[in-house]
Amino acid sequence: MSALILDGKALAQKTEAELSERVAALKSKTGRTPILATILVGGDPASATYVRMKGNACTRIGMDSMKVELPETTTTDELLAKIAELNNNPDVHGILLQHPVPSQIDERACFDAIDLSKDVDGVTCLGFGRMAMGEEAYGCATPKGIMRLLEAYEIPLEGKHAVVVGRSPILGKPMALMLLNANATVTICHSRTKDLQSHIATADIVVGAVGIPEFIKADWIKPGAVVVDAGYHPGGVGDIELGPLADKASALTPVPGGVGPMTINTLIYQSVDSGEKKLA
């Protein structure tokens, strides 16, 4: 058995083509395109790279982006004031605060200051709560991207046992709730779970989101399972030992090229949706 490759890069490219048409139609109708505002506080090179990648994705689909750069010394109040300014700007349809922010800033307060209708990265507590309750809200970009990838490849979720290894507020926790809302039976584990192997051994779907290179071993995973690796570490490895699973899993996300492209794609996807709602 050769595992089906859940190709996030290919799906992201296909989606970008569709989004380009939607943006062009909106521009033809209104003379405007959606605008994503990205906020970068400080000079962290990795964060700057991520912000640039998001801006490039906007450019590829013909959508505008607004880059807001603030100094490392920015205070919580100063960042809150900038977010309020963007909330009140009718030309801005999505707001992304690049994580992490400098330690003197209350990141949670700043995330929660983002207007719900512009929370296209799915980081507010209100958005998380609405998502958990099955109400309309933009999902956290990575888990929402995973759900879109599973849907595109018609991976059945209803009644399946999904084990999510990881509990971060922007990945593990929302991932578990999205799977639950799709009628999967969900077990949440993490790096301190006792006898982790026994939980994973029963899983129809395994999601690695623990942030430790190849923490989840291939021989823990049962034949025919669907394997989703949301990790990425130097050397091109994820959170799961993927090599031996090529002929054991029924489907898997490659690293790189699986989950990663879907994260930025989902941010752009939700930004276009927000723009359509506000401009159409």
From Swiss-Prot:
Binding site for NADP(+): 166-168, 191
InterPro entries: Aminoacid_DH-like_N_sf, NAD(P)-bd_dom_sf, THF_DH/CycHdrlase, THF_DH/CycHdrlase_cat_dom, THF_DH/CycHdrlase_CS, THF_DH/CycHdrlase_NAD-bd_dom
Gene3D superfamilies referenced in this protein's UniProt entry, alphabetically: Leucine Dehydrogenase, chain A, domain 1, NAD(P)-binding Rossmann-like Domain
Keywords, comma-separated and alphabetical: Amino-acid biosynthesis, Histidine biosynthesis, Hydrolase, Methionine biosynthesis, Multifunctional enzyme, NADP, One-carbon metabolism, Oxidoreductase, Purine biosynthesis
Reactions catalysed according to its record: (6R)-5,10-methylene-5,6,7,8-tetrahydrofolate + NADP(+) = (6R)-5,10-methenyltetrahydrofolate + NADPH; (6R)-5,10-methenyltetrahydrofolate + H2O = (6R)-10-formyltetrahydrofolate + H(+)
Any one Gene Ontology BP term: purine nucleotide biosynthetic process
Pathway named in the protein's UniProt entry: One-carbon metabolism; tetrahydrofolate interconversion
Single GO term (MF): methenyltetrahydrofolate cyclohydrolase activity
E.C. designation(s): 1.5.1.5, 3.5.4.9
Record-level GO cellular component terms: cytosol
Xref: Pfam families: THF_DHG_CYH, THF_DHG_CYH_C
Protein's job: Catalyzes the oxidation of 5,10-methylenetetrahydrofolate to 5,10-methenyltetrahydrofolate and then the hydrolysis of 5,10-methenyltetrahydrofolate to 10-formyltetrahydrofolate.
NCBIfam families: PRK14192.1
Family: Belongs to the tetrahydrofolate dehydrogenase/cyclohydrolase family.
Protein name (Swiss-Prot/TrEMBL): Bifunctional protein FolD
Organismal lineage: Bacteria, Pseudomonadati, Pseudomonadota, Gammaproteobacteria, Cellvibrionales
